[in-house]
């Protein structure tokens, strides 16, 4: 779509949106650790009983695995979405999944905190 987005080929050795260039093995280890912990929590912890939390973690994990596959086999992540209407980093669908899942997770946690605070307040 001219003036909005274009497809390009970019090799990203950093993390989401080309941040922190380099450190391939560190990012692989970190991604594996976080992914495994999320999956364990999804199936052993509270994640299984709450659809919002389960969805948020699942979207984060799916994006992380997508980028992890590229990083392990290629040494970099292939980014291809370039928003031309704003000066922004080139990114991919997995980056979108991690970002949207994280936003959803933060919203869930805020909602959960406020719900607990309201529960603790005495009724007038």
Put a short name on every predicted segment.
Residues 1-124:
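Alpha-helical transmembrane bundles and membrane-interface segments of multipass inner-membrane proteins
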